[in-house]
């Protein structure tokens, strides 16, 4: 049961590319003015390949390994334009935890808590994180960004940006001073076992078909400890549409959530 509680938190906080025990240092005093948040976002877009490269693709698949507290398994992350996602973590001897968004319905399944249709802030976050061209088009979710300090994350100098969403949530993103790329985030997610403030760290960017992709994702939270996702496969434009279909276990629950669903087509 404890294992699946941790997996519930992992699944709830995953859908990005985030607490106690995070490697953040105290803010570093600046001798110069902080760059505007919009400029940091623009620099990130260029640093990962540019708008044209991002918009040249319509889907992506990542595959690799997952490790947490002596437990290991496999992970696959599927995403597609304009806003679809599916994440599945399989652990031998325990089973598979899955989460998805088909452009309208957000859902997750695990062996302990069963199938669930997402609503409210959980659905809003999943919609935002499923935006395939993120950060392009993020204005539909974000009402403001502000650079608040120069600090450190994962032994890197980063600019800390406070983000406010249209549903009045505030969270932080961190942009690498040297490379310009997104280095991580801190955000609170709602899980089946309560809220979890989660630090996400992005490492090991590699160029794939003109786009730079982080191949290592580290997540830390007080509730779930540390999880490390290492991807060995990254490919664009090879994902079948059927991957994003709502599972049979979820369909009976969809009627109760349709009033909060939104289409991105």
Residues covered by each model-derived region:
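N-terminal secretory signal peptides that target proteins for export/translocation
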Residues: 1-6
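C-terminal segment of classical bacterial N-terminal signal peptides
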Residues: 14-28
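Soluble non-cytosolic domains of exported or imported proteins
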Residues: 34-38
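N-terminal mature ectodomain segment of secretory-pathway/periplasmic proteins
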Residues: 39-114, 141-152, 265
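Acidic/charged, solvent-exposed loop-and-adjacent secondary-structure segments enriched in E/D, K/R, S/T
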Residues: 107-133
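Short, conserved active-site entrance elements at the starts or edges of catalytic domains
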Residues: 125-160, 181-186
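Gram-negative outer-membrane assembly/targeting C-terminal domains
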Residues: 248-265
């Amino acid at each position: 049961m404890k294992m699946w509680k941790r997996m519930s938190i992992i699944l709830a906080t995953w859908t990005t590319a985030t607490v106690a025990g995070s490697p953040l240092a105290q803010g570093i005093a600046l001798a110069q003015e902080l760059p505007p948040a919009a400029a940091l976002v623009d620099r990130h877009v260029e640093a990962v390949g540019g708008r044209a490269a991002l918009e040249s693709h319509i889907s992506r698949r990542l595959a690799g390994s997952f490790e947490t507290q002596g437990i290991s398994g496999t992970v696959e992350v599927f995403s597609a334009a304009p806003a679809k996602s599916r994440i599945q973590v399989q652990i031998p001897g325990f089973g598979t935890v899955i989460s998805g968004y088909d452009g309208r319905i957000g859902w997750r399944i695990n062996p302990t808590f069963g199938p669930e249709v997402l609503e409210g802030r959980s659905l809003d976050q999943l919609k935002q994180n499923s935006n395939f061209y993120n950060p392009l088009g993020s204005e539909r979710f974000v009402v403001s960004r502000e650079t608040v300090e120069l600090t450190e994350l994962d032994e890197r100098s980063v600019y800390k940006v406070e983000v406010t969403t249209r549903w009045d949530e505030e969270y932080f993103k961190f942009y690498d001073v040297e490379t310009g790329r997104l280095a991580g985030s801190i955000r609170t997610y709602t899980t089946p076992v309560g809220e979890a403030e989660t630090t996400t760290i992005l490492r090991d960017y590699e160029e794939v078909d003109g786009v730079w992709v982080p191949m290592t994702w580290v997540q830390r939270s007080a509730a779930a400890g540390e999880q490390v996702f290492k991807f060995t496969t990254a490919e664009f434009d090879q994902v079948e549409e059927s991957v994003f279909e709502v599972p049979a276990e979820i369909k009976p629950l969809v009627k109760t959530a349709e009033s909060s669903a939104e289409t991105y087509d």
